[in-house]
Amino acid sequence: VEMDGDEMTRILWKMIKEHLLNPFIELNTDYYDLGLEHRNETNDQVTFDSAEATKKYKVAVKCATITPNAARMPEYNLKEMWKSPNGTIRAILDGTVFRAPIVVKGIEPCVKNWKKPITIARHAYGDVYKNTEIKVPGPGKVELVYTGDDGTQIKELVHKYDGPGVAQGIHNLCGSIESFARSCFNYALDTKQDLWFATKDTISKKYDHTFKDIFQEIFDAEYKEKFDEAGIEYFYTLIDDAVARVMKSEGGYIWACKNYDGDVM
């Protein structure tokens, strides 16, 4: 699947195909134009179509795309402020983004004690990238409400506002977290590297703690013996402790992060 992009990436990708690919191979791709203008013309349907095609064919090349902000609205005469194509595609694929640095002699890392690559494993679903936000106009309360199919409700007060503010709702799925955990454990076994996982479960006692619990349950039930045989380990710690440990380490491991944490890292 070929996903074209915006601005200079369109020119560079065209040159890559003309000079490096087409002269040597028969390039048979399913093409989708994810340029902002075409996304606007199709009401962003092209983004969803490209993701579904990727699920079908199992491999894709995506060029860089513009995620519009308020300034882009008049510039491109947009119908609405379309969401991030990357976020949409990741949510549909429900995958894990593995970012492994390329180590090159002569290019020294900023942290001198880093000797081996540190691979970031980023959950590709949910969190702030599938959020719902509101601007609170004035005094009142914001509540989090779950309504089951049988009509039962769970209600939690988010905040009692004395004046204007903002509120945000995020979510995740246990099935997606389980897929994320297994992909991280399998990648660690394939590459024979230790796996770290970090959240802030001491503060987020239900959301983040669910991530921690699912990882541990799957590790104990499915991967502990395999890790022991491979001579590697799974290690959990708080996200702030993980950052400190990373700065002191030599590298050579996989660091699994929730969606936003992985984006930052």
PLM features: residue spans?
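Glycine-rich phosphate/diphosphate-binding loop of Rossmann-like nucleotide-binding domains
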Residues: 1-15, 19, 144-237
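N-terminal alpha-helical transmembrane segments of multi-pass membrane transport
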Residues: 8-13, 17-43, 51-54
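N-terminal glycine-rich phosphate/adenylate-binding segment common to multiple enzyme folds
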Residues: 37-153, 260-264
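Short glycine/threonine-rich loop-to-helix capping motif typified by GTGT followed
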Residues: 41-46, 205-215, 247-253
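Glycine-rich phosphate-binding loop
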Residues: 54-67, 222-265
